[in-house]
Structures are given as C-alpha cells and as structure tokens.
From Swiss-Prot:
NCBIfam families: SA_tandem_lipo (TIGR01742). A lipid is attached at residue 23 (N-palmitoyl cysteine). Its main location: membrane. The keyword Zinc-finger does not apply. Pfam families: DUF576. It is found in: Cell membrane. It comes from Staphylococcus aureus (strain COL). Belongs to the staphylococcal tandem lipoprotein family. This is Uncharacterized lipoprotein SACOL0481. A lipid is attached at residue 23 (S-diacylglycerol cysteine). GO terms for cellular component: plasma membrane. Residues 1-22 form the signal peptide. Keywords: Cell membrane, Lipoprotein, Membrane, Palmitate, Signal. Transmembrane segments: none annotated.
Length: 256
C-alpha cells in the first residue's frame, strides 16, 4: 500500500513539472510572437506601398475607432524626412508632411528645412507651404534658392516608391517593449542589395557604404489606434554620424 502511495505521489509530481514546463513554453511562444505582431501591424499600411498616386488615398479608409465623429471620412498624413549629420556636430534635416483630407479631397502641408546645433544654440527651421493637385506637389511660398525650389517641386515620399512585399521574410529582429506607454520596437539588419536601400541611395547623398538598419516603432495598441502612431526609420548612421530616413503614414480623424 505504501508503494502505491509513493508511486501515485511520484506521478502527481511529474504531472506538475510537465504542467509548469508547458506554461513556460507557452510564455516564450507568446513573447516570440511580438515580433510577428509588430510586423503584421506595420503591414496594414506597408502593404499599400508603393503609393505611386497619392490621390488614391482619398478612396482608402484606415483603422477607425471611437475618436472618429459620425460622417468623418478621416485624414491621411504622409511624412518623409532625410537627416544627415556633418563634421561640425550639426544635423541637417529636410522633408515634407502632407495631410490628405478625405472629406474635402484636398491635400495641404509643407516642406521643411531644419538645422540642429550641438552647442547651446536654438535650431533653425523654415517651412514652405505646399498643396497637391493631380498628384503633383505645388509650392505656394516664394523660394529664392532654385535648387531648393526644385527639390520641393520634385519631392517624392518614401511611400511612393518603397516596396515591402517581402516584409514577412525579415526575421530574428531585435525586439524591445515599453509596457508603460505601451510602445514596441523591432530592428533588422538590411542589405545593400535591398531595392528600398538602392532607391534611397539613388535619391539622397548617403556618404557611407554601410548596410543600414530597418527600425520599426509603434506607440499604442498593436491592433490599431488613431491616438498612437507608427514610424519607420532606415538608419545609415556610422561612427556617431547620424544619417537616416524617417517615414510614416497615419490615419486620423479630420474633424476635431
């Protein structure tokens, strides 16, 4: 009888051990899946790339939540900037932000030129108003510099030529999570053979052969939120010299 009791106790302990081990593996699987959740969240917008004609966004609806008022078709905001540091510890940053209102089917925004200084000096910033008609950027402000004027009128957002159809092939990224926000980040090493990298090198003066990092950042619910945001960065930085392209496409209420 004592033998049977000991045997039953042994079986119970083994079942408990397997149950605990199973729970541990379940937690690991859950944590490992965060990378896939981040990619799937980004894919909701990146699958739209390339958006060759930005006016197509007038007919596309994004994630809607309780922040949207009844009848509000929402507004898309597309953004791209290129930042490059120089030897004197200054950072030059140029780019454009465009708001496409689906209610009025109008697109307005601005091109910006910024310079940041390392020392105790406020940054310089200049905005130039633009609008878009027939998928063409129209400069509304007077610009004396012919080179700057050309850059503005010929500007293309990263989302107009980027292609992330193979996003699912990016694996083993470096994932970090801040549960307090919450915010989620994942980083991947890119190849110089990547078509997106080739496109950026052909459009910007990138003085390094270093293969960049793809950085994906999400603030808010992974399932979607009109309050949070997603930001994609392709970082070419080398030896303390910042060189990067930042892109985002967001969908928010147009009516406050």
């Amino acid at each position: 009888m004592g033998y049977l009791k000991r045997f039953a106790l042994y079986i119970s302990v083994m079942i408990l051990i397997f149950a605990i081990a199973g729970c541990g593996k379940g937690n690991e699987t859950k944590e490992d899946s965060k990378e896939e959740q981040i990619k799937k969240s980004f894919a909701k917008t990146l699958d739209m790339y390339p958006i060759k004609n930005l006016e197509d966004l007038y007919d596309k609806e994004g994630y809607r939540d309780g922040e949207f008022k009844k009848g509000d078709k929402g507004m898309w905001t597309i953004y791209t900037d290129f930042a490059k540091g120089n030897k004197s510890d200054e950072l030059d940053d140029e780019g454009m932000v465009l708001n496409l209102d689906r209610n009025t089917r109008t697109a307005k925004g601005y091109y910006f030129v910024k310079k940041f200084y390392e020392k105790d000096k406020l940054p310089d910033r200049k905005n130039y108003k633009v609008e878009m008609k027939n998928n063409k950027i129209i400069l509304l402000d007077k610009v004396e510099d012919p080179n700057l004027k050309k850059r503005i009128e010929n500007f293309k957002f990263f989302g107009q030529y980027a292609n992330f159809k193979d996003l699912e092939n990016y694996n083993n990224g470096d994932v970090s999570i801040n549960w307090n926000v919450p915010s989620y980040d994942v980083e991947y090493k890119m190849s110089n053979k990547d078509e997106n990298v080739k496109q950026l090198r052909s459009r910007y003066n990138i003085p390094t052969d270093k293969a960049p990092m793809l950085k994906m950042h999400i603030d808010g619910d992974l399932k979607g939120s009109s309050v949070g945001y997603k930001r994609l960065e392709i970082d070419f930085s080398k030896e303390g010299r910042d060189i990067s392209v930042i892109d985002y496409l967001s969908y928010k209420p147009a009516k406050k």
